[in-house]
Amino acid sequence: MRAAVLQLSSQGMSSTKFYNYIRIANKKGVKLLLLGEYILNPFFKELQSMSASMIKEQASHQIKILKELSSTYNMTIVAPIIIVKKKQVYKTIAKFAPASTSYYEQQILINYAHWNEEKFFANEIKPLQTPLVFKIDGFKFALISGFELHFDEIFQKLKNKNIDCLLVPSVSTFESYERWKALITTRAFTHNCYILRANRIGEYQDKEFTWNFYGDSILVSPNGELLTHLGNKEELMIVDMNHADVIASRRTWGFKEAINKRVL
């Protein structure tokens, strides 16, 4: 399975840059393209000062374009996008496939004093559901937000899905590089699946400090090995993943087998 991460700062959909990267990915045989958080939309702090009608207009335009690009280039595009329903603003991750579009509504949102998405967005607080799972050419993906990677309960929902790759768009900042790398490699190893993480770049300046989004998009193997990563610049990362390697990792470590023996 050939996939790609497009590591960018916040982009308007009129950006020729975005179209050019899509064409390059298509020529390289990419089947799935992953974007980081707050690339199609302004950063969360900027969204807070925008009207719902403006966000809705922006989202409608973006969705139309992404559907067309997915169909034109026969490529699945996974992209976090802010949408509006009945004047309420929701944080979602969209999967634009050539023949269909699906949305995963983020279930656990960050809720700290300096960064409270849970308070701003209308995403319902309810019992956790299984994240979006789908296949491309027999290769099974699941997708969650970067913040949701912290929670064991999310992985409990995925434990019997036998996914090959977990897609994780993120918006990491504040020099958290080492912590995120440790978290991603550990999750990939203990669940014996690839993790492809797309993090945005750029910065946001508020009254108190500068939020630097440092990139470092990465691919980690089912054995917890860091296979490839980007720096802090605008880049396209093309990766190859193999279902056979996922199966081999599961058989080698036997984590799920050890638990299944003990399930009543």
Q: PLM features: residue spans?
A:
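Active-site-proximal beta-strand elements of phosphoester/diester hydrolases
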Residues: 1-12, 34, 105, 139-148, ...
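Hydrophobic residues at beta-strand termini and immediately following loops
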Residues: 6, 104, 134, 198, ...
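Short, acidic/polar
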Residues: 14-24, 150-158
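Cys-nucleophile CN-hydrolase/nitrilase-fold catalytic domain and related Cys-dependent amidase chemistry
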Residues: 19-98, 102-106, 173-187
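CN hydrolase (nitrilase-like) catalytic-core segments centered on the catalytic cysteine
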Residues: 55-78, 150-236
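Short beta-strand scaffold segments in enzyme catalytic cores
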Residues: 79-81, 91-95, 132-134, 197, ...
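Active-site catalytic loop in hydrolytic enzyme cores
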Residues: 84-161, 175-176, 248-254
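A conserved C-terminal secondary-structure "cap"
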Residues: 246-264
